[in-house]
Swiss-Prot record:
Binding, [4Fe-4S] cluster 2: C151, C155, C158
Localisation per UniProt entry: Cytoplasm
Gene Ontology molecular function, alphabetical: 4 iron, 4 sulfur cluster binding; aspartic acid methylthiotransferase activity; metal ion binding; protein methylthiotransferase activity
List of residues binding [4Fe-4S] cluster 1: C17, C53, C82
Annotated family: Belongs to the methylthiotransferase family. RimO subfamily.
The protein's name in its UniProt record: Ribosomal protein uS12 methylthiotransferase RimO
């Protein structure tokens, strides 16, 4: 009497940024198409894949810790992702890992899984229940859309180009077809991600591709125009403040894409920006922000900054605080500088900022920006907003407005049971706010 072969099972841990999450989704989609079952525990898996982060040393430490945990609990571990470019460092700590690959090495990861636990020979991918949009690790109502790999910048604090390579833009027709599948599957919000969204298409000289039989240039403006036709929220992340960003502001003002820009300014002091090898035109940037807001008063700007970069003086830091007062950014994150192995900043010969000074500056930065953010959110009280529901709890619902990207920004809280479910879009009036969150009532 024949028996049905057991379904091969894979455990998966995804660390790091949304771009790494998209890599994980691609690998999982391929494995699911080949009949593998993805399981949530180490003990139920035949093999575990760990998609690592290698952006800063603390992320590497977390990656090594998770690899060790997977080895202890399962024993069969495949490593991929950004830290995978440092195979020696990984094998020095965990010599028993079965395979180590870098980011975007989808085929190699799948092949490594095959070697440990081959796919079932009787599996028919034509009848497998893999959705057309692939496997997604986000809630059903929003998804990340990665438009390119790599980066052409050489920021002194960053090693991403050495891990992910130079900019490689995905064909715009392919990107738009993926977005269309996502929306048809119920996605209400598309979060556009890359290492440098504003540079999309530079590497292919903005060549024309085709989507649904019509020509579309491989460029941020044309991509946004096409995405706006799908009927979902479109949110732009990792945008550099280049002149071509001016072109998408009218789309935001017209309500075609969300009036939201995620721009990693990193600092404001010209001296520090020069050391970071970042664009050092802070005065032009302020003028650009003012111009954007004149065209689109609803515009929300989120950014991230680094304090305590080598050579940063109290004067530089105060310059940054003054710049924040001028810029009036809405959503801001801040990190204390942490040396990254292999980063050019290590060789600049600049004075290190003591840890206690970094902490003190971080505290001052956060207090300064929280006051700005709180004041800006207070201006929303009494106004109407659309809220996309993320969670429904016993005491009420939690969602987000155009102000709020998932995971990194604030939330909108709606008290009471209104019968909402995740993915619903609800028109509300803001009744209260603090420095991060808003409270609203359905209209």
């Amino acid at each position: 009497m024949s028996t049905t072969p057991a379904t091969p099972k894979v455990g998966f841990v995804s660390l790091g940024c949304p771009k790494a999450l998209v890599d994980s989704e691609r690998i999982l989609t391929q494995l699911r198409m080949e009949g593998y079952e993805v399981v949530p525990t180490y003990e139920d898996a035949d093999v575990v894949v760990v998609n690592t982060c290698g952006f800063i040393d603390s992320a590497k430490a977390e990656s090594l810790e998770v690899i060790g945990e997977a080895i202890k609990e399962n024993g069969k571990v495949i490593v991929t992702g950004c830290m995978g470019v440092e195979e020696g460092s990984i094998r020095d700590v965990h010599p028993s890992v079965l395979s180590v690959t870098g980011p975007q090495q989808y085929e190699q990861v799948v092949n490594a899984v095959h070697e440990v636990v081959p796919p079932r020979q009787d599996h028919n991918p034509l009848i497998d229940l893999v959705p057309p949009q692939g496997v997604k690790l986000t809630p059903r109502h929003y998804a990340y859309l990665k438009i390119s790999e790599g980066c052409n910048h050489s920021c002194s604090f960053c090693i991403i180009p050495s891990m992910r390579g130079k900019l490689v833009s995905r064909p715009v027709g392919e990107v738009l077809s993926e977005a269309e599948r996502l929306v048809k599957a119920g996605v209400k919000e598309i979060l556009v991600i890359s290492q440098d969204t504003s540079a999309y298409g530079v590497d292919v000289k903005y060549k024309t591709d085709f989507w649904n039989g019509r020509p579309v240039k491989t460029r941020m403006l044309e991509l946004c125009e096409a995405l706006s036709s799908l009927g979902a929220w479109v949110r732009l992340h990792y945008v550099y403040p280049y002149p071509n960003v001016d072109d998408v502001i009218p789309l935001m003002a017209a309500g075609k894409i969300l009036p939201y820009l995620d721009i990693p300014f990193q600092h404001a002091s010209p001296k520090v920006l020069k050391s970071m090898k970042r664009p050092a035109f802070e005065d032009r940037t302020l003028a650009r922000i003012k111009n954007w807001r004149e065209q689109c008063p609803e515009l929300v700007i989120r950014s991230t900054f680094i304090v305590g970069f080598p050579g940063e003086t109290e004067e530089d830091f105060q310059y940054l605080l003054d710049w924040l007062t001028e810029a009036q950014l809405d959503r801001v994150g801040c990190f204390q500088y942490s040396p990254v192995e292999g980063a050019p900043a290590n060789d600049l010969g600049l004075a290190e900022v003591p840890d206690d000074v970094k902490q003190e500056r971080w505290d001052r930065f956060m207090a300064h920006q929280q006051a700005i953010s709180a004041a800006r959110l207070q201006l929303r009280i009494g106004k109407e907003i659309d809220v996309l529901i993320d969670e429904v709890e016993e005491q009420g619902s939690v969602g987000r407005s155009f102000f709020d990207a998932p995971e990194i920004d604030g939330s909108v809280f709606i008290d009471g049971d209104h019968g909402f479910k995740p993915g619903d879009k609800v028109r509300c009036r803001v009744v209260d706010a603090d420095e991060y969150d808003m409270w609203a009532e359905p209209i």
